[in-house]
Amino acid sequence: MKNIVFCGLSSRAFSMFIKPLMERFSTHYEITGLLDADPKRFAVCKKKFPELAHVPEFSEDAFDEMMRVSKPDIVIVAGRDDTHVAYIVKSLQWNTDVITEKPMVTTVQDANRVLEAEAKSEGKVTVAFNYRYSPFHRKIKEMILDGKIGRVTSVDLNWYIDTYHGASYFKRWNRSRQFSGGLSVHKSTHHFDLVNWWLGQNPEEVFAYGALNYYGPDSEWNPLPEEDGRFCGTCRVKEKCHYYSRWHPRSSKASIKDDHLEAGDQSSLYTAYRPDACIFDEEIDIEDTYVAAVKYDGGALLSYSIIFSAPYEGYRLTINGTKGRIESNEFHEPSRIPFAFPEQTIEYYPLFESKQTIQVVKNEGGHGGGDPLLLEDLFLGKDPLRRYDILAGAEAGAYSIAVGEGMWRSVAEKKPIGMKELFQMQNV
């Protein structure tokens, strides 16, 4: 039996880690400590999981005490993004393994701190990049490894975050770069890690454009531009807000599924934080639209775009190689898509042969059954039958962050950003 402690009692910590640990891995692990900056989160956690009523609680400045009392074998870091680095580094100083939610940290400077701490530690860092585990994404990796498309030359990845999911980031702490690193870090690092992993190459340089088009005070959808600092729960013009109306349909029977934004007043779950801030606030300092080009050290090129206010959620993917091409389109969450859409497949186009359509079987669980497989690898060890590495470590986390930070810096500085330059610049 191994001991696990949590730094950060977020909704993600509950759904992705605590619930599965209690239901599927309780014969292997025991949760022996809970740490959070907000005392109310302990009550929320223990109400949701009564079995944890006896587990000691620790404030954010009591990390060392928790390590002495709870004696963890693994520290799971799942709080606000900017808090990750301190707990990861401290855990490594205690020679303890770390599982961290993505993004690993929010800046390349902090990524350097993690890499340096890991090099001196007996512990290691694992980043919970669950997109790698999607059955479609694993199949694409296998096709590339099998040489189906030869040497990869370019990737086109267009990602669409819909008005439900996209708006949620601008209601919450994610809308501040100091907390999230911006959405090029908080969200796009998922996508960059996926491409980095598919290619088996490291990014060298990124050039990007970006803008705030849908949210913030200048949005054409803002129903009351002259008033700042509103909250959905008390807003006097919320019935005129298209984003609010999509999440709060007039029919009480209507149900929209989203794991980032919950209907109803959530303020009682926190001490001094409201996750229903106005998406048109002046304080928003991040972008909601990006277009970027990334060059890799193995010769591959990535063309990437993402918007955070699309009519539907999903992606369009093309991977070109010297011997063929892979295409796949995903439409995410049927309850949020207002039209009929096809099942996802993988289209394989050999360079001089006929097209092949590949069906992929989805399993139970999030991300097409990918989440349960990630959890098995995290808590039961790597699958001995899998012929390729899939768990992400600190270096993978660092490269994904470097592309994300390089992207927003390129937007701000209007120039290409080299990864080597970025790591050296931030190595202070």
Swiss-Prot record:
Keywords, in A-Z order: Oxidoreductase, Signal
Name of the gene encoding the protein in the UniProt record: yteT
InterPro entries documented for this protein: Gfo/Idh/MocA-like_OxRdtase_C (IPR004104), Gfo/Idh/MocA-like_OxRdtase_N (IPR000683), Gfo/Idh/MocA_Oxidoreductases (IPR051450), NAD(P)-bd_dom_sf (IPR036291)
Entry function: May play a role in the degradation of type I rhamnogalacturonan derived from plant cell walls.
Organism classification: Bacteria, Bacillati, Bacillota, Bacilli, Bacillales
Domain of life, per lineage: Bacteria
Protein induction: Up-regulated by growth on type I rhamnogalacturonan.
Signal peptide (residue range): 1-23
Family that this chain belongs to: Belongs to the Gfo/Idh/MocA family.
Covalent S-S links between cysteines: none
Protein name, as recorded: Putative oxidoreductase YteT
E.C. numbers: 1.-.-.-
Recorded GO MF terms: nucleotide binding; oxidoreductase activity
Organism from which the protein derives: Bacillus subtilis (strain 168)
